[in-house]
Amino acid sequence: DFDVTDGAAGREWVTAEKPDAIIHLAAYTDLLKAETEPAKCIDVNAMGTLNMVRAALAIGAKLMLMSSSEVFGAAPDVIHGTRDKTCAANVYGLSKVQAEEAVRALMTRSFIVRTGCLFSAAPKGEICGILASAQDHQKLTISDDLMACPTYTLDLARAMVSLIQTEKFGIYHLINEGECNLATLAMATLGMVGSRCRVQPVSGYRGSVGIHHPSSVRLQSDAEPHLPRWEDALNRCLDEIRSEIR
């Protein structure tokens, strides 16, 4: 492990390991905290990416940057394609825009992967959190005013690994097909496990966490690889959770 904000450490690592390709996942991801310490967020996400770009160039490796739907300061009901102009709505989004700019300016053998609203079988993740809350409550109150494209981390990882083995460089939106709000995601989760807990949709996501957040973070997948429907992905995620419990 090394600190991506330390350019010398990054160059030392890639020089020693000599990878053919680098998937750059290290990031500052706390949207709320980023508003109170913007310099740190930008240092990790923007400068850290610049350091990894320079390290990749030093050994001739191709690089894949994990970016985010937060690069768009979207108006309601806008679905963003890969060619749309970025316009960050918060500090985290700005840091990712700057990271993308560093990659595009200096590298031709690169991939920029945007995604968002990730879910997984992780014990502290969104899905396990919904299931745990449903065990303790008869009703959950969850926001219905943020539209997104829920994406299973396992599907995302497989697509990224497949993509980086190619020479099809460019910007990609890797998301599970379909869209929903957070309340619908929770309803689907509880329905698939047969829970009697009810979900009460409520408005109020925007502004409730102290940051400017777009009302729509939907992305359009313009090119392969295309990921399965989010409902199918959620069902497989729940299967993974069940298998880990046994």
Q: How should each PLM-predicted stretch be described?
A:
Residues 5, 36, 40-51, 86, ...:
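Glycine-rich NAD(P)-binding loop of the Rossmann-fold in SDR/ketoreductase-type enzymes
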Residues 136, 159, 166-210, 238-239, ...:
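Mid/C-terminal beta-alpha module of Rossmann-like enzyme folds, strongest
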Residues 197, 212-246:
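C-terminal amphipathic/interface module of NAD(P)-dependent oxidoreductases
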Residues 74, 87-111:
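Active-site Tyr-X1-5-Lys
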Residues 101-148, 154-155, 161:
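NAD(P)-dependent short-chain dehydrogenase/reductase
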Residues 4-44:
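NAD(P)H-binding glycine-rich loop region in Rossmannoid oxidoreductase-like domains
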Residues 22-26, 63-69, 113-115:
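SDR active-site strand-loop-helix element
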